[in-house]
Design a protein with these regions (language model features):
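Basic, Lys/Arg-enriched alpha-helical interface segments
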Residues: 1-67, 76-80, 87-123
Length: 123
């Protein structure tokens, strides 16, 4: 049974203007996440350090030699939420900048779930 993968508004805003070839590469890895769920490992997914969320992970996408990362987490419903993405190539502070944003997006998502409202969108 495939896992549900939803997207945050922030992820959608980042993803929508990307060129089609990059979107295709990202969607390939998202489909692997749908198939394997939390068991997806390197080279396509990895755990993160420096986060207060034990289940915050990254999808790893290589596109034309550039390293793209999508931060995601599984919520209590065991559905993945793609939080935020970007090209980390040459940016040593990428994780320091993006992890706090991803944590805030996920916390907001959890609050929404507690209220009984769903805000995830399936790619």
């Amino acid at each position: 049974m495939p896992f549900t993968v939803n997207t945050s508004d922030e992820f959608g805003s980042w993803f929508s203007p990307l060129e089609e070839a990059l979107q295709d590469d990202i969607l390939f890895v998202v489909r692997l996440l749908q198939e394997h769920g939390p068991q997806l490992r390197r080279p396509y997914a990895d755990t993160l350090e420096g986060t207060s969320l034990s289940n915050l992970k990254e999808l790893r996408v290589q596109h034309r030699g550039e390293p793209y990362r999508i931060l995601f987490a599984f919520d209590p419903k065991r559905e993945a939420l793609l939080l935020i993405g970007g090209n980390k190539g040459g940016d040593k502070r990428w994780y320091k900048r993006m992890i706090p944003s991803a944590e805030a997006i996920f916390e907001r998502h959890l609050e929404t779930l507690e209220k009984g409202e769903g805000n995830g969108k399936t790619p």
